[in-house]
Amino acid sequence: MGILFENCDLLLRGEDGGYSTLHGFLGVRGDTIDYIGTEKPTGEYEEHKSMEHKLLMPGLINCHNHSPMVLLRGVGSGLPLREWLFDKVFPIEDRLVPEDIAAGSRLAILEMLASGTTSFSDMYFFPAETVAAVAEAGMKANISRCVQCFDENQTVEQNTQIPQSVELFEKYHNAENGRIRIDFSIHAEYTCKPHIVRAYSELCKAHGGRMHIHLSETQREVDECIARYGKSPVAWFEELGTLDSPTAAAHCVAVSDEDIAILKRHGVNVIHNPTSNLKLGSGFAPVRKLMDAGINLALGTDGAASNNNLDMFEEMHLADIMPCGYRHDPTEVSSAEVLDMATVNGARLQGRSDTGVLAVGKKADIIALDLDKPHLYPNFDTPALLTCAAHSSDVVLTMVDGKILYENGEYKTLDREKVFYEARAVVKRLYA
């Protein structure tokens, strides 16, 4: 029979990309929004929820994550990317087992649900464990097993990660009524050899898959790639056929005008990760240049080990204010554009055209914020309120496909105490 949200403020996006708020009603039947209006609908709903002083908006989409890395939160703080990754992170990851990934994924999901994230894109190891966690929790996710190769003598047939990735796709793609999608993933240029990248990229294209990569995260990465191959990482991936599939490229901090032209030509989606890039001292993506080129720009937290949380409201805040300060121009990026990055642009990147906005016929991926807070009054500009004033702690409800997964501090699908118990056991073993 469905759920009717009554007397709430609704964040609506017009066809022109502008945002407005409507005070009224929103109805959900099954997994779909079936009513939006100022008058109470005549149809019957099984459940009625009074939402005075609440704002309903699309769920946030975290397009670049390594969710089990919540177990490494704070490891190697203060180091630049390469030293952090090779000296601190990789040695711990070498000791991870599937049970660790299961525990870390569920802990990350608790954090994401409570902070208004309804879908995320993930690349990591033992991804079937993350698939199971997402299925249990009721979230949406694009999950991938990232491929690496440090040995130039390793043949394609000897690389065990490639068949693991393909098997994951064939087994789980579009599972749970499409809530779970499987992507292909290459970690980065500096962690994979060309012959592996070319062969794996061909497999992705043959399967009609989407690709998730790290790309031009630092100037050092670009300089070393040019020294090795005579071209930038962007041009390198283009030459090897990776960009021939729908691609999500995380970071793109150190990209030239020529790189941006390549990204545009291939329809590459770029994921802006402001907190991680700032924390690791990597720099800041040329947001305005990318958007002016017509590139779809989404938003991500990166893993909690380099952030150190999965809070998309914090990402929106930095994505809003940092370009303006860096360029000495308060019009460099608008709050509405940042809100798009965290919602509709993220949906586009994940291949989910049926979500990302509140509209009749769209999937009911909805979050509610409590506006009855000192820091949220008055409100003269809702996008700016959300990107520059709201906190993740203002989230009081998270719904995915019409099912409430989190409400007023209570998780509906996961046992919070069990998740913490299992996560503590993993941390104790890893860091004993």
Where are these regions (language model features)?
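A conserved active-site cap/scaffold subdomain adjacent to cofactor or substrate pockets
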Residues: 258, 264-295, 300-301
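Active-site gating loops and adjacent loop-to-helix segments of metal-dependent hydrolytic enzymes
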Residues: 71-103, 110, 140-162, 219-246, ...
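Divalent metal-coordination and catalytic microenvironments
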Residues: 8, 26, 31, 53, ...
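His/Asp/Glu-enriched, well-ordered alpha-helical/loop segment
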Residues: 239-246, 288-373, 389-391
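Active-site microenvironment of metallo-dependent hydrolases
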Residues: 1-24, 29, 39, 342-432
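Alpha-helical scaffold segments that flank or form the walls of functional sites
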Residues: 73-139, 162-175, 423-432
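Metal-coordinating catalytic core of metallo-dependent amide/deamination hydrolases
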Residues: 129-253, 258
